[in-house]
Amino acid sequence: MARQFYDEMYDARGKCRPHYQEFARWLAATPPEQLAQRRREADLLFHRAGITFTLYGDEQGTERLIPFDIIPRSIPAREWRIVERGCIQRVKALNMFLADLYHDQRIIKAGIIPAEQVLANECYQIAMQGLDLHRDLYAHIAGVDLVRDGDGTYYVLEDNLRTPSGVSYMLEDRKMMMRLFPELFAAQRVAPIDHYPNLLLDTLKSSSPLDNPNVVVL
């Protein structure tokens, strides 16, 4: 019988996966009370900094602290490169799809997607019809939600193009991990993410036909 979930840290025989071994040794050597204390410190620091989130659909707008998990999601570089290429390919396809919908609508004419499914959708913007965008770049940012089945195969749960939230939480969570657990980063080669704001700026600039446009993020 196939496994109903994928254990990121241990394989089916209960053996620690190679890319988690260093972390497993650190975790085994760290007293539980020390982990609990650092978790409380993280909650306090997030609270003081006002780093919270609101659940969609919550009419009261109740703000909640970011759930801080000391167990990291560790992905080997070779595995991540495959995921990265797949995400890039997917976002390119989605931009081509949007460019077609707002221009020739070949995908509708070919009967692949019913016209009413697009034209009657509340997110369809009739004012965008026929409007040419520089480099046909409709989605500058994509929040691709990934899941894994019991065998460890990655699947895309959904593509968040309209409201791709979560990047700021990722950046703040990494800062918190580096502040509370610097020894983990000293022992392993962890890919940096602090250059994300520069990547975002470059992406937004590239969507303009001007050489050096002003960029405002609302």
What is the role of each PLM region?
Residues 1-218:
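Preference for protein termini
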